[in-house]
């Protein structure tokens, strides 16, 4: 709290236009006016976002994480995107993650290049496929969820 607050004061004194984002200001309202230039949360439901935006918001609202693409998800993206047209103070959100975290290795059996994630090397403890939650694979090939993102983002060009 105190260090982030000091950083925000520093940037304000420099008057260089930098904005400060700190998600935990939602959980500690003592810093709400000094620690973040945004109202921000992770994974708030669309109705929770609207509750803030309908009650005289003091700051723009950003979802610092709002879609987690584990498996083949993104099904709720449209509910959040509708808020963009409805509220000037809603500035969207950030998808977690854009890209899978994996490394390319040569498979010892087939000799082919394959992507490997946590746990594929008998490493323990491991996050296993939890690092495979992007909208593109680690080799930059698109996952099916990218179709949903492309559709909704395309409406706002």
Regions found by a protein language model. Give the residues of each.
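Surface beta-strand/loop "capping" patches
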Residues: 139-157
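Substrate-binding/catalytic cleft of secreted carbohydrate-active enzymes
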Residues: 1-139, 144
């Amino acid at each position: 709290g105190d260090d982030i607050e000091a950083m925000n004061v520093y940037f304000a004194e420099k008057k260089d236009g930098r904005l400060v984002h700190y998600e935990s200001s939602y959980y500690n309202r003592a810093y709400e006016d000094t620690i973040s230039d945004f109202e921000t949360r992770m994974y708030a439901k669309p109705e929770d976002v609207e509750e803030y935006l309908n009650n005289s918001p003091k700051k723009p609202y950003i979802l610092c994480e709002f879609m987690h693409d584990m498996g083949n998800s993104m099904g709720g993206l449209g509910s959040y995107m509708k808020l963009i047209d409805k509220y000037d103070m809603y500035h969207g959100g950030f998808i977690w993650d854009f890209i899978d975290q994996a490394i390319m290795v040569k498979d010892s059996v087939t000799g082919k290049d394959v992507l490997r994630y946590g746990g594929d090397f008998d490493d323990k403890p491991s996050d296993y496929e939890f690092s495979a939650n992007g909208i593109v694979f680690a080799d930059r090939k698109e996952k099916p969820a990218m179709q949903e993102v492309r559709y909704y983002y395309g409406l706002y060009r």
